[in-house]
Amino acid sequence: MKIISHRGNIRGPILEKENRPSYIDCAIGNGYDVEIDVRLIDGQLWLGHDEPQYKVEHSWLQPRKEYLWIHCKDLAAAQECCEYQSFCHTSDPYTYTTTGKVWLHDLSMKVNDAIIPLIDDPIIHLAQKPYAICTDYPYLLN
């Protein structure tokens, strides 16, 4: 099972570091994939959950693409990032990623081989067999 760090967090949320490129690189360096939040504003890619915080280029994304799961925060980002592992949603119970995986938000749905975000809960009690889990606590899952 793949473990995906939520915005670069490894040992719990650190809001001021989330989506920071160096923080993301640290999570990748520790062996995790990372879910990041990306938006496109005036032709420029930005990392940041609620607002654009860190400007990045494709030259930063490209060498990390096999480790990144890009949550596209707007339609422009979805169009720009379709070559990467990416997905978009607002309040949907599930969404498909560009790699064909189901990113499942409604945990009452039982789907094997899906990606399950257990952001706030470091303890897992799952009936299904997920492809991956996205969490702020990846170190607890090793």
Residue spans of the language-model regions?
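Phosphate-group recognition and catalysis centered on beta-loop-alpha active-site segments
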Residues: 1-142
